[in-house]
Amino acid sequence: MTTTYDDPRRWWALAALGLAVLTLGFDITIMNVALPTIATELEVGTNGLQWMVNAYVLVIAGLMLTCGALGDRYGRKRLLLIGLGLFGISSAAAAWAGSAALVIAARGVMGLGAAIMMPVAFAVLAALFGPAERGKAVSFLVMGLGIGIPLGPIIGGYLLQHFWWGSIFLINVPIAIIGAIAIAALLPESRDPSPRRPDVLGAVLSTAGLTSLVYGVIEAPGRGWSDQVTIGAISAGLVVLTAFVAWELRVRDPMIDLHLFARPQFLWASIAGVLVTFGMLGLLFVVPQYLQFVAGHDALGTGIRLLPLIGGLIVGAPAGERLAARAGYRVPVSAGLAVLAAGVAIGALTDLQSSYGFVAAWLATAGLGIGMALAPAMDAVLDALPTEQAGSGTAITMTLRQTGGALGVALLGSLLAEGYASRVNTAGLPPEAAVAARESIAGALAAAAPRRDPQQPQRLTTEQSTDLDEGSMKVSSTTLWWYPMGV
């Protein structure tokens, strides 16, 4: 393996990697603030919006471990350049897509590029930095990823305020070009001299199982939970995931070393990380829609009003670390989950008369819980692993968290969609408006908007508009209740 411990260019290479990782982070959530605009522009329902979010995260979760192994075998610099190329090209395709199907497909390819870059970016640090500096370099990349996730809605809001919705994807293109040039010039090639064989079948089984399972969850509100397609998709997903577990237990070089879960600390810390990511990404799917559709804020205003969540996270992270040093990992992780659940439960009390101060308070509370739990949970995972398994154990945890985020969006979004059919009052609306109102929040708010065309005989009344707004608010708050109940 080529090393460049004394090469001053290594810090510039780290900066390029940090920029790429920051982009991967905010691309996980940048879609959320744009969902209302995309729903209107492309006439997309809730199911389609969920797949625009999940296509990216789910591909990352399914392919991250395999892509990391490919980097070890074929060269990490080469894989990084391939990942950046896929990410940049698919971002441009998504920006100019004219249909929901094309956006979803492009997001899937973006996820493939991210799945290549995320593990390889961390693995390549071994060729750049010696043991004394490596911890600082790893922290830099982790910080970039952590800041990028909550930063996504703010960047997205600013872009939507000044440009069209495709700009949230187009911003990735120059970053990918700059990153590719910097990596090609500054990064040495490195590979594992004795790499493990890639677990292709394991990757296929895990991706197919998760995709089928989440597809069933997303489709259930529209088709019904007893529908054959819903039952078939969920059942197939569970069967394939069971086969995945059986395969991983017998294959020589498994994608996931399931024996790690026999370590209690690794198990509970991994579950805690999944719960936190589930709640964070699920929250970032539901709340922007409330802020735009119900509270009436524009895209940038929505992003800015999510800042209390980031503020709580920034305060909670060091507090959790200090508490872990004094009382062990379980205390801050358990306390963080409790604070997060409490914040979301308070958020479920939000109604049409709630002030933004109330919303900001419970968002900050939820962010505080996320910050308190997330870093100590990762520290607990690393502490439970022997040194020789630190890399694979970290990759497992990252994959599980990405999967938890995808399921958070799917399950909370599924509950959100299901509520419209039963709780939004469309009595007295014209047939087309009633169908649109039951399909999604975008349709409900479009139907609720007073029609100013004097030639239109079926003008909505103030009472009808209020009923639809209240229906949207009720189903949003009911959806938020499910997270603290689950925790």
Predicted regions and their residues:
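Transmembrane-helix bundle of Major Facilitator Superfamily
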Residues: M1-A185, A319-G320, A327, A348
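Hydrophobic transmembrane architecture of multi-pass small-molecule transporters
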Residues: I178, A380, I396, R401-V487
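Symmetry-related core transmembrane helices of the 12-TM Major Facilitator Superfamily/SLC fold
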Residues: F169-I183, A233-V239, Y483-V487
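Transmembrane core module of solute transporters
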Residues: R10-I60, G144, W164, I171, ...
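Hydrophobic alpha-helical segments of secondary membrane carriers
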Residues: F140-G144, A272, I396-R401
